[in-house]
Amino acid sequence: MAYRLARGLGRLLLQGVFGFRVEARGRENLPPGGGYLLLAAVHRGWMDPFLALDAVPVEPRVWTLGSGPSGFDRAWKERLLRIVGGVLPVWRGGVGIEVHVAAARAVLERGGVFSTFVEGTIGGPPDRPTPFRNGAFVIALRTGAPIVPLAVAGTEVLYRGKRFATRLMPPVTMAELVGEEWNGVPEPGSREELAVARRAAEALEALLAPVIAGIHPATVDPPGRRRRWPWLTGLLLGRPRA
């Protein structure tokens, strides 16, 4: 109940107060129920996980693997994230992949959705992804869960009335991403596992890149349009306004 209320209040704040507009498509591609990995790109700011939440239904619940330093760098952010819930913070150098695999298994076995942004860090061009990290694909190998790709665009700068776009794509498996080179699930912790994860990361990047490039123009305002409340970039993204 608290989770539903928090999501409703969050939508009221972002769309009603800040006037953010989201063009979200592709829910028809979601598998019935939960138990899948939601792997998203691009990752350009603190707003991105909220767009991932907006892209999917309220239930099943989404748990997001996110950056501890950027998500909890201000007291108000920490309070908001604790109210909304579902954030699994990552602190660089803190834990190994086994902890994240265990967290993903716990979420998936209960019918939830495990989400992360596969670039692994914030920053890069607004209309194309930076190279994907291997970690999410190791999780996919060890859990056997299907992958739902999510394209996100428009969060590189914020102001009142800013437009965003998301696209959910049909589920894919690790075997489908790897293609003809797939020889089954490799031994956990082996070099082969890392090699398979890398091939899958490159394949998903190739799959998402044209979708991101295609939806980004819809988030860009015409030249000369006045930007109201440009300070939202600094407030929500933690960097100077554009």
Question: For each of these PLM feature ranges, what is it?
Answer:
Residues 1-9:
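Helix-enriched interaction subdomains in cytosolic or periplasmic regions
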Residues 11, 78-79, 137:
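Active-site phosphate/pyrophosphate- and oxyanion-stabilizing loops and adjacent acidic/basic residues
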Residues 15, 81-82, 107, 140:
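A generic structural signal for well-ordered alpha-helical segments
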Residues 98-242:
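Non-catalytic C-terminal accessory region of glycerolipid acyltransferases
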Residues 32-94:
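Catalytic core of membrane glycerolipid acyltransferases/transacylases, capturing the structured
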